[in-house]
């Protein structure tokens, strides 16, 4: 896709996942977002179903479901008192006047953030058509750099470490 930025320059953007899909016989924009339903946040479009807790301390955490399988996860926060409420920003259908390609990419995803879920860090999940990107945002240098999560896998899924030492799903 090509976009015109505020300064009248043009940027060509390629995507790793579909940006259009057919709905009722017509091509429509894929604009992943989040809506609140049944006390949780749910993605509006995508190749999978995801739901997120309204609070970072909610034992329900986050759940991703696809093809009859599911993964649920939640942070083991070390927060002292208080709660971390979810903050949502959704994909923006209005893409004119963007300053940069980074703004463009951010405008094409739904995001849920939990500020202060850890004493010195926040969590942010960006929802795209084919996946979720988790970012741990550290608020101060020299703080804690170990963060714990609880995962629950279903239907024959198992976790293992890949060559980079990161969790990798296996069937």
Segments and roles (model prediction):
Residues 1-171:
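Residues that cap or anchor secondary-structure elements
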